[in-house]
Amino acid sequence: PPDDDNADMRDIVRDWIWYGYHAASAIDDWIDACAARGDGFDLPWIKAFARAERQHKRAAEAQWPAATDCDRLDHAFAHLAGQGFCALQWAGDTLDDGFERVSQTINADDVPTERYTTGFCFFHSQDMDHALDDEGLSVAFGHVDPDSDEDNVRMGRLVFEALEWVGLKP
């Protein structure tokens, strides 16, 4: 039954399933937790929707190539991390969230100061939504301690090269 609460929850569940960052059990646990706190949606309907959406995604995945753009993106971000980048995927829901996550990651107490010496790059959920709509994936980037705009431009070039290196078209 599509009322506002059900429609909102349906949209979030669909996004989380297609983003691919959470196991089905984690999404189900999150749905249960939202219901337990009284979020006002129809729990059986949302659970049925989640099951059907997972089946739909599995059918789509069966048609995907062995190496997907997501796999290539993982490799590019791992490569950048190896070069001293703070490379974060799904860094919140907005650009501001992403910058905050980068700052938290770089400045965490258990992170050696020499770990993130080069730059940072990230994307957030709105960027993933655009990618799922075939509008491309935006990746934010910059130098961790820029002396000039050229430092940030150089980081952009490194991100571009890493994406190109794994076969993505930046």
State the predicted function of each range.
Residues 1, 134, 138-170:
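Acidic, proline/glycine-rich low-complexity IDRs
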Residues 1-35:
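N-terminal leader/presequence regions that precede the main folded/catalytic core
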Residues 33-58:
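Repeat-associated, polar segments at repeat-unit boundaries in modular proteins
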Residues 100-138:
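An N-terminal amphipathic alpha-helical segment
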